[in-house]
Amino acid sequence: IRTSEWLPTFPLHGHIYYAFGWEQPVWIHPSIFLKPDGKGKMSKRDTDALLEEGKSIFLGDFDKMGYLPEAVINWAALIGWSYDDKTEFFTLEDLVEKFSVEKLNPSPAAINFSKLDHFNGLHIRALSVDDLAERIRPFFVQAGYQINDDEKLRQVAEVLQIRLGN
């Protein structure tokens, strides 16, 4: 899977596979991601401005910002693809089962960080309280709090679970 920007080099890469006698993969070229305002393609050169707003396009930053991997996958899958017009919450297993290349939208899609917050909240509420407690522990430790009482952390997680977005 490579964005449509790679279409001009597709014949070259196809010939390389042919020359080496390798089996051709299924080549998929979805549309590019646009900046949140919909004006121009999203670029790593836009990273500094995004970080000032508390956002990022780099996977390594999402974890530090409190986003669950499940939420990031759900969000990213729905940029330029949809299963139907009703379903938006997907586990990884759901996506493996339901994803189809035929439902990719060829039009460029703007990155919507509010949707990422929304999906993160949905996935946080889908966790067990014990799982959430373990996932928030590092954030408390990083903030300088010593967590010596697992039951208290569990109680805090239970209260926070309905309010957290990220």
Positions of predicted regions on the chain:
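Conserved nucleotide- and phosphate/pyrophosphate-binding catalytic cores
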Residues: 5-11, 15-166
